[in-house]
Curated annotation (Swiss-Prot):
GO terms for biological process: translation. It comes from Lactococcus lactis subsp. cremoris (strain MG1363). Keywords: Ribonucleoprotein, Ribosomal protein. GO terms for cellular component: ribonucleoprotein complex; ribosome. This is Large ribosomal subunit protein bL28. Pfam families: Ribosomal_L28 (PF00830). Belongs to the bacterial ribosomal protein bL28 family. Residues 11-23 have a biased composition (Polar residues). PANTHER family: 50S RIBOSOMAL PROTEIN L28, LARGE RIBOSOMAL SUBUNIT PROTEIN BL28A. One of its GO terms (molecular function) is structural constituent of ribosome. The keyword Ribonucleoprotein applies. It comes from the Bacteria. Residues 1-23 are annotated as: Disordered.
Length: 64
């Protein structure tokens, strides 16, 4: 199971730190993922979901 949002597909991306002199170094930007149990089509599933997705769960999906 990868660290990717089950609903939105958000995952870790790479970005740059920028200093005042505009030097750049690589860094990692991670989404706010929570491990949650959901009830989907009568089945219990444990999935990674972003905090934003948990605010607006799709129809037919219930958090347990």
């Amino acid at each position: 199971m990868s660290k990717e949002c089950y609903f939105t597909g958000r995952k870790t991306v790479s970005s740059n730190n920028r200093s005042h002199a505009m030097n750049q170094t690589k860094r990692v930007v991670k989404p706010n993922l929570q491990k949650v149990t959901i009830l989907e089509n009568g089945e219990l599933k444990t999935v990674w979901a972003s905090a934003k997705a948990l605010k607006k769960l799709p129809a037919g999906v219930e958090r347990v």
